[in-house]
Amino acid sequence: MNILFEEFPKTVRVNGERFLVETDFREWIRFIQLIDDAKVPWQIKCRLLLQWYIDGIPDDLETAVYALGDFLAMKTENAEEDESITGSAPKQLYSFEQDAECIYSAFREVYGINLQTIPYMHWWEFQTLFAGLPEKTEIKQRIMYRSIDLRTIKDKDERKRIKKIQEIVALKKKNRRKMTDYE
């Protein structure tokens, strides 16, 4: 997909059929918060996630949930699947909850966009603008420091300095709910 001349998608495809989905960035941040909510059992989450479908819920619920995940990740229908398996999930480098102020101020500073008053912004547009924020913004600085592997820094003083910054900007650990045998 080329965003310079193609519109952002408003639908997902489930078993060959197109379904309209919510596209506003606020709804997708809520989607992420729901997924991350340790208090909500996975079966209930899946049912709640189906509310992101506007014009009816697909019959194949599992595929429907995966289609929403693909939309969240901005996967296009003809995108090649990444075949590499790393064995672990990538490290979380930002949180829409914990970094909200930094994200908000970066959008105001760089793009002149007030995320509270803008009536609508497509999730993919939001993500594209977020990725394009300059490195000098606070959120990009936090992401950069959180991503540094201290083992790669040879200089002891520099490693100590970076470690101190990482402790300051670290994401707070959430208590993850343990899954039951039925999940």
Task: Go through the PLM ranges and name each one.
Residues M1-L20, R26, D36-V40, R47-E183:
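Charged interaction scaffolds used for protein-protein
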Residues Q33:
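Short conserved micro-motifs at the rims of enzyme active sites and ligand-binding pockets
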